[in-house]
Structure formats: structure tokens, C-alpha cells
Amino acid sequence: MLRSKLSSLREYLTPINHNSNFLTTGEISPEEFVKAGDYLVYKFPTWQWASCPKDLQKLFLPTDKQVLVTRHVPSHQRANEYFEGEFEVEIDEKDRDLALGNESNLKNGENGENDDEAEYGWIRSGRSSSEKGTGEVLDPQRVEEVNDIDELIDETAEGEEEEEEGEEGEGEGNGNGADFHADDDADYDDLDIVQGSHSKLRRYDLYITYSTSYRVPKLYLVGFDANGIPLLPQQMFEDINSDYKDKTATIEQLPVAHNTTSVSIHPCKHSSVMRVLMKHQRARREHENVAENMKRLSIGSEDHKEAMNHIRRLSAGSKELAQKQEEPNDSEIKVDLYLVIFLKFIASVTPGIEYDYTMDAL
């Protein structure tokens, strides 16, 4: 708990910054945190603002908006079970460079030290066991975004990745009785399956607070088993992706309650991840705006020529584009969406906790 106390001290000593620069740094001010929280609560009522004991309140936040909370979020399988299978997706090299800040791949490309996956533009990612054999078609954009997030988080790690493989056997009914007992045997088999599923069920209370030291949201997890008994930190770590649990997860006292142990997702790299995610979303909106304008223009018209000139101005490295990105426009991401995008990022760290239903807002 020494790290938890040091973190609390750092939060206390860091001065509050009220300047708004989330588009360029990925950081937000307390006022922007409240604004983004209001939007999250409005769009998704399972999230609610809450207060906390007076001695734990942050004076720069409203007393009734100290923390965002959603309760009893289900988790039916552990993280290592969620990523039982693997699949490969080919993505554009420019998108890889964008997600990595144009650093990792460019360096590897210059030195010729790419491994097989990097050389051919492949990224390996996990696949939910529930998706196996269903014939479901995956959305390439969604897969690409998740892979971008994985690459960003993995950059912060030191040493080699450790793979964890866990297999759990489940009991099955024999069903070998006489014909007049067949239905009863089937009922018992179904009961065993239901009981086995219930024993795996966990529920989480999720808390989002504002970190003054990093100027980003910070997520805390408090878990319970199927009987409502609080989970130990080691048990909660089972619901965090094994690639990240030793890199970004920390055992801390919940800062908005007394004597409550939680697991936090450390926010040291949140701002850089958020900056790249917002850049992706902004580029997508710019592309949609141009496509919409093209639909309204007739081929061969003077307006069409103007549209083509506009597309050229949107090319990478254009000074005019750089100036426009500094000014608010229809393609810019508003701060209201910050926490929605933040939860999209967190979903890759805690894949088995089923709270990532915010994607329709983007």
C-alpha cells in the first residue's frame, strides 16, 4: 500500500490546471471532466455522479460530482478465457504509425529489424471464445482500433511479454440412464451448466475519478463474487488482460471511500492513448465530411473541381490542414465525448467486464 499512499500524496501536492488543451495533449481540466461526465450520465444512465465523505472530497469539483459510478457490472469469464483464440488482421501501415506516434515502426523500418508480424503489417490479437464458430463477420475498423490501443499500451512495457494459458474442465452429465429417465438426466445436465456459470459470475462496481497529477480520468475496480463477497486484489487481477495487469494495474485504497481496497488502472499513459484515439476519430470525421460533400456535387462541374482542390489541401503535410486542425470545426472531437472514448480504451484492458456499451455514441 506504500505506492497507494505515494500516489495520494502526489495527487494532493499537484497544483490544479484549469487550462483547456485536450486536443493537443490528451489531458483535460476538472471543468472538462465534469462536462464529459455530464454527457456520459446523460447518454448512458447506468453511470451516475456521486458524492463521497466530506474529508475525501476534492474542493475543485462540485460536492455532488466527485466520482462517476456504475454498479453491478457483470463479468462472466476471466480475461485469459476471453482471449483463448487468436486471429490475424492486416492493417494499413500508416494507421500503425499513427497509433504508435510514428516512432516504433519507423525506427524498425530504418534498421530492418522488423519481425515477421511487423514486416508484413500483421498484428496478433485475442478473440473472445464466444465468437468462435459463429460465422460472425468482424468489423475491420473496430478490430483496427483495438489493435492500435494494444500497441500503445504495450509500448510502455519493459521486458518480454508473458503468455498465460489456463484451461478449466467443466463437468458434463452422462445421460446414460433408461429411456424414461432421459428427460431427468437432461435437466440435471442443464442444472450443472447453470451452476457452473453462476460460480464464474462476478460483479464489479466501477469508479471514475479525476487525477490531478496526470490531468486525466482514473478508473478503479471493486469486485464481488456470485455470492456478493468482496474479491481479493489477486482475484480482480484475473479480470485484467495478462499483457497489462503487471504494467498498468495497481492495488490502491479507493479514494472516495474509507477502508475499501480496489484495483486501479494507472493513468500514466492515458493522455497519449487518448490523443491518438481522438486523432483517429477526427480523421474519420474529416473523411466522412469530404465524402458527403462529394455526393452533393455533380461530376464535371466547377464545384467538383473545387472539391478536388479541397481534398488535395487535406493531404498529409498540408500547412492549411495544420492550421485548420488548430481551430474548432465540425471534424474536431468535443470534450463531451472524452469519457466515452476513455471507456473504449479501458475495455481493452478489462475485456471480460461487460460495460463497453458506449460505442454507439461515436
UniProtKB/Swiss-Prot annotation:
Region (Flexible region): 82-198
Pfam families found in the cross-reference section: Autophagy_act_C
Subcellular location: Cytoplasm
Basic and acidic residues bias locations: 129-145
GO biological process, one term: protein targeting to membrane
Any one annotated GO CC term: mitochondrion
The keyword Protein transport belongs to this UniProt entry's keyword annotation: yes
A GO term for molecular function: Atg8-family ligase activity
Keyword tRNA-binding: no
Superkingdom of origin organism: Eukaryota
Active-site residues per Swiss-Prot or TrEMBL entry: C268 (glycyl thioester intermediate)
Stretches for region Handle region: 272-337
Region of interest (Disordered), ranges: 101-186
Biased composition (Acidic residues): 146-171
Keywords, ordered alphabetically: Autophagy, Cytoplasm, Protein transport, Transport, Ubl conjugation pathway
Domain notes: The N-terminal region is involved in phosphatidylethanolamine-binding and is required for ATG8-PE conjugation. The flexible region (FR) is required for ATG7-binding.
Role summary: E2 conjugating enzyme required for the cytoplasm to vacuole transport (Cvt) and autophagy. Required for selective autophagic degradation of the nucleus (nucleophagy) as well as for mitophagy which contributes to regulate mitochondrial quantity and quality by eliminating the mitochondria to a basal level to fulfill cellular energy requirements and preventing excess ROS production. Responsible for the E2-like covalent binding of phosphatidylethanolamine to the C-terminal Gly of ATG8.
Family indicated by similarity: Belongs to the ATG3 family.
Subunit structure: Monomer. Interacts with ATG8 through an intermediate thioester bond through the C-terminal Gly of ATG8. Also interacts with the 40 amino acid C-terminal region of the E1-like ATG7 enzyme. Also interacts with the ATG12-ATG5 conjugate.
Protein name (database record): Autophagy-related protein 3
Lineage start: Eukaryota, Fungi, Dikarya, Ascomycota, Saccharomycotina
